[in-house]
Regions:
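Short, acidic Ser/Thr/Gly-rich low-complexity loop/linker segments typical of extracellular
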Residues: 46-57
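A beta-strand signature from Gram-negative outer-membrane beta-barrel systems
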Residues: 90-91, 185, 199-250
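Short, acidic, small-residue-rich periplasmic hinge/interaction motif at the N-terminus
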Residues: 28-33, 38-45, 67-75, 83-131
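Surface-exposed extracellular loop regions of Gram-negative outer-membrane beta-barrel proteins
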Residues: 241-263, 379-390, 398-399, 404, ...
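Outer-membrane beta-barrel transmembrane domain signature of Gram-negative proteins
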Residues: 457, 461-476, 480-481, 493, ...
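Extracytoplasmic beta-strand/coil segments of soluble accessory domains associated
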Residues: 59, 139-189
Length: 981
């Protein structure tokens, strides 16, 4: 990054400050009582404003030609032209209507409310609802209150257990742009390669930002690439940090009280607690502010497996246990059973077999008659699970996987500040640091599996994936007016690191020398963005505004290798196994199966996968918005971007709003958009242990510049290109306290990037196939997968939002209803490379499972109905959310029923929709202290169970591949809120 030009321009702007004035005043109600927390915004300047203190007083820097907008919940908003006034006393009149929120997203002109916006924008007052909301992190909050938003906690999905993929309008997590205070937020370093929603994508980790630091969230439900750049195909989410003054705190504790807790043994699990503190103060005497938020939280695991009903122990395991009782470890008598077994081993096995009291005489006779280890091997594979469990004092639930939310421990610290350097200019800064430690489980390694070295783990083990996620960001800039121009120059830096440590596991090829934890490496992503935005009103038609700007973005992506023992396979001498090593050098179990290398559950990043890649992006954009008349608004935006790694893109957007009546608007928009392949998708390479057709396999994800991709004919990634259309209307009836909006949309995305299914090791002997075999063997994988611009998709749907507010003498009632109906479909032919098509592998390139993950694993229909009632010191909140049906990705039974289970015409299990009820009651002991008791999922509902053939021996009782409302059941919580001063 070249900081010198940026700092020079910053200094130039500071010393080129235009003269203006400081306006002071007071806001009161119609009873002459001061109003605390009134929002005061400069209509012409997005993000510039102030709030009143406990005396109703405020101070703000403005120009004489600007307009102030005063707004407060339960009162009519008021606009006042500044002129030459130095002091103001503003009286707000109460009215039963919704607070008019001035939007940051959707238009650079500023000063628009969501009812007057030419595109649909939802505004969620996080600060207002934090007292009564059951949810505490952003993903959970948005999943509950925003029908077009979907995100649930993932289970047994490697890193996805620690980062919840989030989707808007059914599109990918990487097709929604996230802003913080109007500035582009960096994405996570993690890329989801498991078989869960959002597979193959990179999203923004919303949970690095504490919800207590936010005043509101704006969700722009429309394509906006022409305004904001890459990723804004589905829309834009803008998170606004608090500017409050004073000290407030919140303490929450809750957990899951449900009969399914603790693997269906009941009681309570998944306890979680959170402490939030926010402090704000004035900065200077001209309306500056400084606001801090600290948040700390812990979350325990939930356990939702059933009872493992598969095989666990065979006869060899039983004999091995009896030998261990005598201090004799049978694994010490061989390292490769086929070449170096100690001659004593046969005699020892026969001897200890006699101590297994449940072996009948006939079976013992078979063992005693064996003349070699080869004779014993088929005999000792016999299952004796029930008998051996009883002998060892274990039960089947001891072999359950950890199926449920991961545990975590985290902290966040965020700051938001602005300081006027004159009456007309201010410098600002915001950002934060967060840390999150998480622990999740993988697939259980049972004693009768080759993946388990029973010399160290005679009872098997449950490996754990732990992550250390560190995230930091800082944005700083200067903004103000130079004449009629509003300028905003900023620099935003963000960095995310995702580090893996694998615990309670082993590298089986190391046998007795294996540690039980491994440094598996880390992923890093950093992004630096420099923006210069300019806008000004112009005298054209009724009212017009022109905006333009430039942006330079630098991105860096790194893979850091893990320790050698986290990924290497070792031979019988303890050295790294050469690629050309004969079978006689490989470490085996008793039955002759080669013991796999690398940390079980998740091998580390290999040395040859380590890399650091960078790219630069340059952009220029312009936007023109005009009220042609008082009833007709038009907006046009264009954007050009150049990427150093794949080329150029040009996009546009047109939008209009027609005011039929003072509070009745029609709106429509058309745009093109794009999403550049993330730098992660371009260069990520790693090996994961995935379940494929019910079998655990090491699967390599190879990037598109690899030799393997070239041999398979996988083409280099290009940008996704989109076209969007939307139309709708917005109606507001102030005297009835009612507002309504409905919007229909259509989005086509060409060249959607997906992660292919896994290709198996070639069996032929052509030169290309022989080379691929070497690549497979060198990476120690049995299957490989790639990223590819594989398909074109179309998404269409409708959003409806209805809000009603009723204020009476003794109570206030707010009602909100919203629903989203959406459908995503693959259209046209699959973009299959010639080599793959010629080999008949098109189903592996984009499978039926891939189609369902793209189209149907999240609900197509979602609706919420909420009520918020305040009576005196009491506040009650009731919300019902309907999560529509979803479809499991696995093909099981075509178009029929199996008991209570329903399947569609293609054989996928249908997960039917359900209504989830949330209820909370709060009591305000004083104006500054309240206590809330609440229940999320009041009636303890769960998704439909997996059909038996698809529940992995009763481990995945509920699908882990679909995303409705999670699988944790009823959640109860208690929350105390304090406004100290």
């Amino acid at each position: 990054m070249k900081l010198k030009p940026f700092l020079s321009l910053l200094a130039f702007l500071v010393v080129s400050i235009a003269g203006a004035q400081t306006l002071k005043g007071k806001v009161i109600d119609d009873q002459n009582e001061p109003l605390l927390g009134v929002t005061i915004l400069v209509k012409e300047v997005p993000n510039k404003g102030a709030t009143t203190n406990e005396k109703g007083e405020f101070s703000i820097n403005v120009n004489t030609n600007q307009t102030l907008v005063f707004s407060y919940i339960g009162f009519q908003s008021k606009e006042i032209k500044v002129g030459k006034q130095k002091n103001l006393v503003v009286t707000l009149i109460g009215e039963a209507e919704e607070l008019p929120e001035l939007l940051v997203v959707g238009s650079r002109a500023g000063g628009r409310t969501k009812i007057d916006s030419p595109v649909p924008v939802d505004v969620f007052d996080v600060a207002k609802t934090s007292k009564t909301q059951p949810q505490v992190n952003l993903n959970q909050i948005l999943n509950s209150i925003a029908p077009s938003f979907t995100s649930t906690t993932q289970v047994v999905s490697d890193g996805s257990d620690h980062l919840d993929p989030a989707q808007l309008r059914g599109l990918g997590p990487d097709q929604t742009l996230v802003l913080l205070n109007g500035k582009r937020r960096h994405t996570s370093a993690f890329i989801n390669v498991n078989g869960t929603p959002g597979r193959g994508t990179v999203g923004t980790d919303l949970n690095t930002i504490p919800s207590f630091a936010l005043s509101k969230i704006e969700v722009l439900r429309d394509g906006a690439s022409a305004q904001y750049g890459s990723d804004a195909i589905a829309g834009v989410m803008n998170l606004e940090l608090k500017k409050d003054k004073g000290l407030s705190a919140q303490v929450s504790y809750g957990g899951h009280l449900t009969p399914t807790a603790n693997d269906h043994r009941g009681n309570f699990d998944g306890g979680q607690g959170q402490l939030d503190i926010n402090y704000g103060t004035e900065l200077g005497k001209k309306g500056g502010f400084l606001n801090f938020t600290f948040s700390a939280q812990f979350r325990d695991k939930t356990h939702r497996a059933g009872t493992f009903d598969g095989d666990i122990f065979n006869a060899y395991n039983a004999i091995e246990r009896r030998a261990l009782n005598h201090g004799d470890n049978l694994s010490r008598y061989f390292s490769n059973i086929n070449v170096n077994a100690d001659p004593r081993l046969l005699r020892l096995i026969k001897g200890y077999a006699g101590e297994v009291d449940y072996f009948d005489s006939s079976y013992l006779a078979q063992i005693q008659s064996a003349n070699s280890i080869a004779d014993l091997q088929p005999i000792l594979k016999k299952d004796f699970t029930e008998q051996e469990l009883a002998y060892r004092g274990l039960n089947r639930k001891d072999y359950n996987m950890h199926v449920g939310q991961s545990s975590l421990l985290g902290t966040q610290f965020f700051v938001n500040a602005a300081f006027p350097v004159s009456d007309n200019w201010e410098i600002y800064a915001f950002g934060g640091q967060s840390y999150r430690y998480g622990e999740a489980g993988g697939f259980f390694r049972r004693p009768n599996q080759a993946r388990t070295f029973t010399g160290l783990y005679p009872n098997g083990y449950l490996p754990k994936i732990t992550t250390d996620i560190q995230d930091s960001s800082i944005s700083a800039g200067i903004r103000g007016e130079a004449g009629k121009w509003h300028l905003d120059l900023s620099n935003t830096f963000g960095r995310n690191e995702f580090a893996y440590t694998i615990k309670n596991t082993g590298n089986t090829s190391l046998r007795f020398a294996s540690p039980d934890y491994f440094d598996a490496g880390k992923l890093r992503f950093a992004q630096n963005t420099i923006n210069l935005d300019l806008s000004r009103p112009i005298e054209l038609f009724h009212k017009s505004n022109i905006s333009f700007g430039v942006e330079q973005r630098h991105e860096s992506y790194s893979t850091v290798a893990g320790a050698e023992n986290s990924y290497a396979t070792y031979d019988i001498t303890g050295g790294v196994l050469p690629l050309s090593a004969p079978a006689s050098q490989k470490v085996t179990d008793f039955f002759g199966n080669a013991l796999p290398g690398g940390a079980q559950v998740l091998p580390g990043f290999r040395e040859e996968s380590a890399l650091t890649k960078t790219r630069n992006v340059w952009a220029g954009y312009g936007e023109f918005e005009t009220d042609i008349t008082q009833w007709l608004l038009a907006n046009a935006a264009v954007r050009y971007e150049h990427y150093s790694d794949f080329g150029n893109t040009f996009n546009y957007k047109l939008a209009t709003r027609v005011k039929l009546f003072p509070h009745v608007n029609l709106r429509a928009a058309a745009s093109t958009g794009f999403r550049a392949p993330s730098i992660h998708q371009l260069y990520y390479t790693n090996i994961n242990t995935l379940q494929i057709n019910g079998v655990l396999q090491e699967t390599g994800t190879f990037n598109n510049i690899s030799r393997a991709a070239e041999l398979f004919g996988i083409e280099k990634l290009q940008e996704e290109k989109s076209k969007s259309l939307s139309t709708g209307f917005a109606v507001k009836i102030p005297k009835a306290g009612l507002s309504l909006s409905a919007d229909a949309y259509f989005i086509r995305v060409d060249d959607r990037i997906i992660l292919t299914e896994a290709f198996t090791r070639p069996a032929g002997n052509s030169p290309a196939e022989n080379e691929l075999k070497q690549i497979f063997d060198q990476a120690n994988v049995s299957t490989v997968q790639f990223f590819s611009n594989a398909v074109d998709v179309e998404t269409k749907g409708i959003d409806v939002v209805v809000s009603h507010s009723l204020q009476a003498d003794k109570f206030t009632l707010n009602n909100d209803f919203a629903f989203n109906l959406t459908q995503t479909r693959k259209v046209g032919d699959i973009h299959t490379p010639r080599a793959i098509k010629a080999a008949g592998l098109e189903e592996k390139f984009f499978s039926e499972r891939s189609r369902v993950l793209l189209e149907e694993v999240i609900p197509r229909f979602k609706a919420t109905l909420s009520h918020n009632l305040t009576i005196g010191k009491w506040n009650g909140y009731l919300r019902n959310t309907y999560y529509g049906k979803a479809t499991g990705p696995d093909v099981i039974a075509a178009d029929k029923r199996i008991g209570d289970f329903v399947f569609d015409e293609r054989g996928h299990q249908v997960i039917r929709g359900k209504v989830i009820t949330d209820l909370s009651v709060a009591y305000n002991f004083t104006p500054k202290t309240s206590l809330t008791l609440g229940v999320n999922n009041l009636f303890d509902l769960y998704p439909e169970k997996n059909v038996k053939v698809n529940n992995n021996n009763d481990q995945f009782v509920y699908s882990r591949a679909t995303s409705q409302f999670g699988l944790n059941g009823r959640y109860v919580f208690l929350r105390a809120t304090f406004n100290v001063f």
